[in-house]
């Protein structure tokens, strides 16, 4: 009898172990399937998608601007399409190249500062002036890079200033909310001053005799 009980216990333990192994294998298979279902996009692909979206948006805005500029110059509805195409190309390069370089530098350097924007501006100037003389390329790179760097620095400074002002305002509201008793309650006015002030008000209220 004892041998039979021990053999039954061993069989039950073996079944439990096999069930747990099957459950573990099933969980691992489910995790693998879910990991395969979730497609992770690497950083360069994200930058490329951002480049495509910004370039398309810039092309749309440039075409609208160029077509309106052609109408303003009285080139007619058909003659304005040339200006629309040229402006669309320029705006697409401006938006797309700038966004792509900023995204790549952010992934490489791990920072989001004015240096990234300045380098992106330089690359944008090179793309707009290409092909051209080396002097024109250098001038365009320096112009766009310096302009982008200065604008980004001013934008960062303005954002920091606005944040500090909001913090001061919140601190002032907190102090006003937790302020002690008002001055009129903390320092009561003496009765003599109250009587003199009331008599003065009554004298002003009396009608004058002419």
Curated annotation (Swiss-Prot):
Chain positions covered by the region annotation Disordered: 1-34
Biological processes per GO annotation: protein insertion into mitochondrial inner membrane; protein targeting to chloroplast
Tissue-specific expression: Expressed in young cotyledons, roots, leaves and flowers.
Cell compartment(s), UniProt: Plastid, Chloroplast outer membrane
Keyword set includes Translocase: no
Keywords, alphabetical: Chloroplast, Membrane, Plastid, Plastid outer membrane, Protein transport, Transmembrane, Transmembrane helix, Transport
Pfam families per the UniProt record, alphabetical: Tim17
Primary site of residence: plastid
Deleted gene: phenotype: Impaired import of CEQORH in chloroplast inner membranes.
GO cellular component assignments: chloroplast; chloroplast envelope; chloroplast outer membrane; mitochondrion
Transmembrane regions listed in the UniProt entry: 37-53, 88-105, 114-130, 137-154
Membrane topology reported for the UniProt record: Multi-pass membrane protein
GO molecular function: protein homodimerization activity
Similarity section: Belongs to the Tim17/Tim22/Tim23 family.
Function recorded in the entry: Together with HP30-1 and HP30-2, triggers the import and insertion of transit sequence-less multi-pass transmembrane proteins (e.g. CEQORH) into the chloroplastic inner membrane.
Subunit structure: Homodimer. Probable component of a protein-conducting channel made of HP30-1, HP30-2 and HP20 that mediates the import of transit sequence-less proteins into the chloroplastic inner membrane. Interacts with CEQORH.
Descriptive protein name: Chloroplastic import inner membrane translocase subunit TIM22-2
Species assigned in the record: Arabidopsis thaliana
Gene that encodes the chain: TIM22-2
């Amino acid at each position: 009898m004892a041998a039979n009980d021990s053999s039954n216990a061993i069989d039950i333990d073996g079944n439990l172990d096999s069930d747990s192994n099957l459950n573990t294998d099933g969980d691992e298979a489910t995790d693998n399937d879910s990991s395969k279902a979730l497609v992770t996009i690497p950083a360069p692909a994200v930058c490329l998608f951002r480049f495509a979206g910004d370039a398309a948006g810039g092309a749309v805005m440039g075409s609208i601007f160029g077509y309106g500029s052609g109408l303003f110059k009285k080139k007619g509805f058909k003659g304005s399409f040339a200006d629309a195409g040229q402006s669309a190309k320029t705006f697409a390069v401006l938006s797309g190249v700038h966004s792509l370089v900023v995204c790549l530098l952010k992934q490489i350097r791990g920072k989001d500062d004015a240096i990234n924007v300045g380098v992106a501006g330089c690359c944008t100037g090179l793309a707009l002036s290409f092909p051209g003389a080396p002097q024109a390329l250098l001038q365009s790179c320096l112009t766009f890079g310096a302009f982008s760097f200065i604008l980004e620095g001013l934008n960062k400074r303005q954002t920091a200033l606005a944040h500090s002002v909001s913090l001061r305002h919140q601190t002032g509201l907190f102090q006003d909310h937790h302020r002690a008793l008002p001055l009129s309650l903390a320092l009561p006015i003496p009765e003599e001053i109250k009587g003199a002030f009331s008599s003065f008000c009554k004298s002003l209220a009396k009608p004058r005799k002419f």
